[in-house]
């Protein structure tokens, strides 16, 4: 674990003792939703989903590690396949540390396993960043977590602070439909990249108040990028938690306008396994603070949550708010317009603030020496133009 803040930047008194919130339920626009803020809650809900499936399981994850949690999930998938459940699993060829041999038992039991974009093919920087688990085409588990022990560890062990949610309702058939397209493309070793680009570009996001947005390398704005960009034109109240915050300048300007005419609260990472992502965010703080945005860096552990509340619209899913998640990686995001859900998720954002360090204009001026500003600008370049796997290897002394 590496903390990216020097002692003078995050004194112990700046953050209160933190405990993960308990699971909570919300019904919004006919969708029954349950949220799991704690790592243990996420893991137990995933295992329960796998253990109780009767007809089908459809999963896709970016990172799948060969560790205790990875083994537990694999064993549950094998058991499901052996009792007659149709099991399908997709992992990303770059993010996952497992291969066909790791899932030999699953395949022997009749399960289907495939890898999205194996390493070192053309266009190696495109990732399947989606996190999807669907049971019996009835309930979907979505969010930001991967299959690795770090994503289920508690804050005191510096586990990733993340969020997962189940949904039951009219949204689930749309998730099933998208998974089918993803699986069809991934299962064909000769499928050209333009095929998945076309699928992302032509995806029907549906009509408000409940929409399923898909992001990816379309050559133009995907349904995810187009919708959030449009919403920010007239937005007046923005609350956001995101692990990686380095948007394009157009979106930064729109966030600044929201802050100037209304209210903007950003809870961003104070710790990460990739210091460059924090530096990239800090390179934008000066302009945001000048516009009146409130910025907080979460202190207890690494932050991985992805949540946007913009007026009465709530965005939940796999996407960070950075160039890669907006324009390059495959992402899945649920958008629901519902005032009660928006109010509840704003309260959830607020629960992070006592455990966060507020970056005031005065504190920013203390941090922002010319040398640090140079390193932050370099970090922004690395995480927006290059790849996280490259920037993660560089210690910029942030």
Where are the model-predicted features located?
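Charged, low-complexity intrinsically disordered terminal segments
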Residues: 1-398
């Amino acid at each position: 674990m590496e903390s990216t803040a020097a002692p003078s930047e995050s004194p112990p008194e700046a953050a209160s003792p933190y405990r993960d919130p308990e699971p909570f339920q919300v019904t919004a626009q006919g969708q029954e939703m349950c949220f799991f803020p704690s790592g243990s809650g996420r893991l137990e809900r995933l295992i329960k989903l796998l253990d109780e499936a009767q007809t089908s399981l459809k999963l896709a994850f970016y990172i799948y590690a060969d560790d205790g949690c990875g083994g537990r999930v694999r064993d549950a998938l094998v058991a499901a396949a052996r009792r007659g459940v149709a099991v399908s699993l997709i992992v990303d060829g770059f993010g996952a540390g497992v291969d066909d041999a790791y899932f030999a038992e699953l395949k022997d039991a009749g399960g289907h396993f495939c890898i999205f974009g194996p390493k070192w093919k053309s266009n190696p920087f495109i990732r399947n960043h989606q996190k999807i688990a669907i049971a019996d085409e009835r309930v979907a588990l979505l969010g930001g977590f991967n299959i690795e022990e770090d994503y289920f560890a508690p804050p005191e062990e510096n586990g990733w602070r993340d969020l997962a949610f189940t949904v039951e309702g009219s949204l689930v058939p749309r998730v099933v439909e998208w998974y089918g397209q993803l699986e069809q493309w991934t299962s064909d070793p000769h499928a050209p990249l333009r095929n998945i680009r076309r699928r992302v570009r032509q995806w029907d996001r549906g009509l408000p108040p409940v929409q399923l947005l898909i992001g990816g390398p379309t050559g133009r704005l995907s349904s995810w990028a187009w919708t959030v960009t449009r919403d920010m034109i007239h937005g007046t109240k923005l609350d956001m938690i995101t692990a990686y915050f380095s948007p394009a300048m157009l979106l930064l300007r729109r966030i600044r306008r929201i802050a100037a005419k209304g209210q903007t609260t950003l809870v961003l990472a104070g710790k990460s396994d990739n210091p460059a992502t924090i530096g990239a965010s800090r390179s934008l703080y000066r302009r945001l603070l000048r516009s009146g945005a409130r910025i907080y860096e979460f202190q207890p552990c690494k932050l991985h949550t992805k949540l946007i509340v913009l007026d009465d619209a709530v965005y939940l899913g796999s996407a960070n708010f950075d160039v890669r998640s907006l324009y390059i990686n495959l992402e899945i995001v649920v958008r629901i317009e519902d005032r009660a859900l928006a109010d509840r998720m704003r309260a959830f954002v607020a629960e992070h603030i006592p455990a966060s360090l507020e970056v005031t204009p005065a504190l920013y001026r203390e941090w922002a020496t010319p040398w640090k500003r140079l390193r932050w600008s370099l970090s922004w370049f690395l995480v927006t133009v290059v790849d996280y796997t490259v920037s993660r290897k560089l210690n910029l002394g942030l």
